[in-house]
Amino acid sequence: MNRQMGRKRLIIYPLCLVLAAAVVVSAAFAAKFIGYKNAPLELSPAFTVTGHTGCMGEKDNSLEAMRAAIGAGAKVVEFDLNFGENKVPVLSHDIPTGGEVTLEEAFRLLSENPNIQANIDAKSTENLVAVGKLAKKYMLEKQLFFTGISEDDVAAVKRDCPSIPYYLNVDVKKGRVKDESYLEELASKVISSGAVGINMHKRAVTKELCSFFKSRGILVSVYTVDSAYDMYRVLSCAPDNITSKKPDKLINIVNQKTNIK
C-alpha cells in the first residue's frame, strides 16, 4: 500500500509542477495580451493593411485571394512572383509547374482597382524586364512595390524595374534589437540599397525598432501577423504596414481602437 502511495506521489507531483507552470505561463500571456490590447494606437498616417496571398481562406496566388483581400478592406494585396515556361511571369511561391495565374491577369485585375496597391513578393528576379513592361502596359507603376528583395537582388530591380520601389527583406536578429549600433548597421544597409523600407518577420519587431527606423526615414513592413495576440502586439509597435492572412480582423481591430464605426 505504501509503495503504491509512493508511486502515485511520484506521478502526481511532477504533473502538479507542470500544471502550475502552465498556469503561470498562461497568466503571463494573458497579462501581455491585455497590455497590448489596451496600448494606445500610434500608427503612421500612411499605415496600410496588406492581404497576404491566400487570405480569407482562398487559394494562395489566386485572383480570388486578391478579390477577397480587396473585399475585406485591405488597401494592399500581396502575391508571389515567379517565372514559368518561356520566363513568363506568374504568381507562384515555388518553381512553376503550369496552370498558374499569370502576372498579366493579376495586373489586369489591379488596373480595375486604382486605389489598391500590390506587394509583389519576388521569389525570383529572372525576368524582371517582363514585369516592368507589364507595369507600363497597364500603367501600374505607382500601385506596385516589391518585397522579398535581398541585397543580391537590388541591382536587377534597379536595372529592370527602376520605377517600382522595393522593401529590403532583412532577417532581423531578435536578440540584438536593443543594440543601437546593430540597428544603425541595418538602417545603413537599407538606405545604401536604395530601398524605401525594411520588410521583416513579426518575431523581431518592437516599438523601439520601428521608431528608430522611422527616424531614419525608413518604412517598416511586418509580415505573418495572423493571430489576435500578434495583431495587437505588432500594432503597438506602430509599423507602416502589416501583412496578414486575416485582413478583415486586423482592420476591425484598427477601427475599434480608432473609434471608427
Annotate each PLM feature.
Residues 2-261:
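Phosphate-group recognition and catalysis centered on beta-loop-alpha active-site segments
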